Amino acid sequence: MSAKRVASRVPSSTPFTAEAATGPRLSLEFFPPRRTEGDGASGGIDGVVMRLRDLNPSFCSCTYGAGGSTRDGTRETVRRLIELGFNAVPHLSIGTDSEADIGALLDHYRELGVRRIVALRGDVPSGVGRARLVHNAETLVRWIRAHSGDHFEIEVAAYPETHPDARSPAEDLDFFARKVAAGATGAITQYFYNVDAYVDFVDRCRRAGITVPIVPGIMPITNLDGIVRFSENCGADLPRWIRKQLEALRDDEPGLRAFGIEVVTRVCQELLAAGAPGLHFYTLNRWGATAAICRNLGLNSAAA
């Protein structure tokens, strides 16, 4: 599939903020470091983010563990990102948190100068069945808007290959539409390697009247077992030809890394040619592959 053919199929999106109209947006995702060194829970993040500083990301987001398990680490990492000069964007997941808990976190982030939130249902905490999660991301978006008005831009998740819990693509699209109706101003997708899936998803969204920017999530490939495990857990399709080549390179670490960078670079090139409003990299707190892919794309700086 050529980039030219993809580009001809993508409907234009309607930007909700000035940044969406200035060019492709580059953003990076990190998680709170599991080890501490130097500055408390945030100590391990400095080296990674500073290696990626020259990419001039529009923002750096920080994940929030299942059931709020990394709440303190997320707050510390967000604070450290701000100290290092980055536009920090915390994830919030509703899990088993109360509306009051969420409100307190929103107040904390507002005091830090945060202007954007990634609002998610989040992973189901260990020992908590899905039936006990009476709230979802739509509820969280409504809580954020009720508590903070229009102070925050709100990003939500989107699933070009359909959320694994959804009974059908139509049901999943309805879930997404309800999050947008509740007040979301943009979306970041689950990662994928099939550009057609993204193109078709955006087309269905536009035909359904959903006009927020939908930024594709990008997962670099650096390890066979890791990408297979991630893909199985989140319902992302790892195309057979990619998996076959990764298996052939299992014992050739440099070759596997080079192949992964080449494949993901190609996916990103096709997405940008197709009119994707940006790229959001799931760095897994590693800088090498993300830096190499962005270098291949000529993304030495991103839209501010």
Annotated model-derived regions:
Residues 29, 60, 109, 179, ...:
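Conserved, mostly hydrophobic/aromatic
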Residues 16, 39-41, 68-80, 98-105, ...:
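Active-site-adjacent beta->alpha loops and helix N-cap segments on the catalytic face
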Residues 60-70, 92-95, 118-120, 185-194, ...:
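Catalytic beta/alpha-barrel core
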Residues 2-59:
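Conserved N-terminal beta1-alpha1 strand-loop-helix module at the mouth
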Residues 37-52, 74, 99-107, 168-178, ...:
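Short, acidic/polar
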Residues 25-44, 66-67, 88-100, 153-171, ...:
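Active-site mouth loops of central-metabolism enzymes
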Residues 17-21, 49-56, 75-85, 106-114, ...:
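Acidic (Asp/Glu)-rich catalytic clusters
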Residues 4, 9-19, 132-159, 165, ...:
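Active-site pocket-lining/capping segments in soluble small-molecule metabolic enzymes
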